Amino acid sequence: MAGQSSSQAASPFQWWKPALFFLVVIVGLWYVKWQPYYGKAFTAAETHSIGKSILAQADANPLMAAWDYAMVYFLAVWKAAVLGVLLGSLIQVLIPRDWLLCTLGQSRFQGTLLGAIFSLPGMMCTCCAAPVAAGMRKQQVSMGGALAFWMGNPLLNPATLVFMGFVLGWQFALVRLVAGLATVLTVATLVQKWVKEAATQPVAVPDVQAEASQGGFFSRWLRALWTLFWNTIPVYILAVLVLGAARVWLFPHADGVVDNTLFWVIAMAIAGCLFVIPTAAEIPIVQTMMLAGMGTAPALALLITLPAVSVPSLIMLRKAFPAKALWLTGGLVALCGAIVGALALV
């Protein structure tokens, strides 16, 4: 008993660490997401628009198209991207591992459901949420919980649903809410069930004594920050440039090209899984393409797959999840988008 008491006294719980983490979360999200989106909701209600399509007016030169899109894209997301990397590194050194294991570490459906719930305040795009999901996996969060958090950020974004209701109509927002929730929970649950967790079990988080031997909080955080940055950001930038060059072929804006057929439902579902966009950018994209003649069914497919995953975000998570899990996630999201669009054809 005396030995146990002395051990507990030697390593008291440091409340300032989770307190600091949640302070960064609240201040960061207020500055990057909550406060800007509050004003944007009034703009959407008054004008029934949140801006131009980020895909429109692509340069015919692929190199110029890649550069132009990268500039527009990164100007839109850089604050959220910085916040995502910051939170993804801080969660590894400030949040006790047992907290995450008790909530998101379970392989049962409870962990997946909690991951979806915890994603709601984040409102991040799939690429900005990816570093946070990678940090969660370093803390041994289950695949289901981390995937639900990652996909829930863009698909269940409350602000996006409000924008969508004012711009595209509340029927679109309702379909997005129901289908988005079903997609997040179904995909995360199936990946958790079908992919062996032990294949790439995350490295165990060291105990208090091991942490002490690795240095103080600041040095451990800098190591986590650098590792996360190096594993995610360079490939992120490269993938955005490549997709920027290909955008004109992925999403044709010519009048009447994308009609209301099963072929285009499947094509848009797949294209949406490949491309990368900022938060809520699917709304003006779909609005512009529908004005050019795109049918409702392909539009619904895009509204599910375009925000949910992208090639850059999947690549960013290549060291956090088994390759099979990422391929399966992309395929299942495309299938969910195709099913939602196909139901609109019935």
Residue locations for each model-derived region?
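Intrinsically disordered, low-complexity non-transmembrane regions of multi-pass membrane transporters
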Residues: 1-23, 39-61, 196-224
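Interfacial loop-to-helix junctions that mark the boundaries of transmembrane helices
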Residues: 10-14, 67-75, 170-179, 226-230, ...
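Juxtamembrane and boundary regions of transmembrane helices in multi-pass small-molecule transporters
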Residues: 16-40, 106, 111, 168-211, ...
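Transmembrane helical segments that form the transport core of multi-pass membrane transport proteins
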Residues: 55-56, 67, 84, 90-104, ...
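Membrane-interacting alpha-helical segments
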Residues: 60, 64-71, 75, 114, ...
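Alpha-helical transmembrane segments in multi-pass membrane proteins
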Residues: 76, 80, 84, 88, ...
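Alpha-helical transmembrane segments of multipass membrane proteins
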Residues: 88, 92, 183-191, 243, ...
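Membrane-interfacial helix-loop connectors
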Residues: 119-177, 251-325
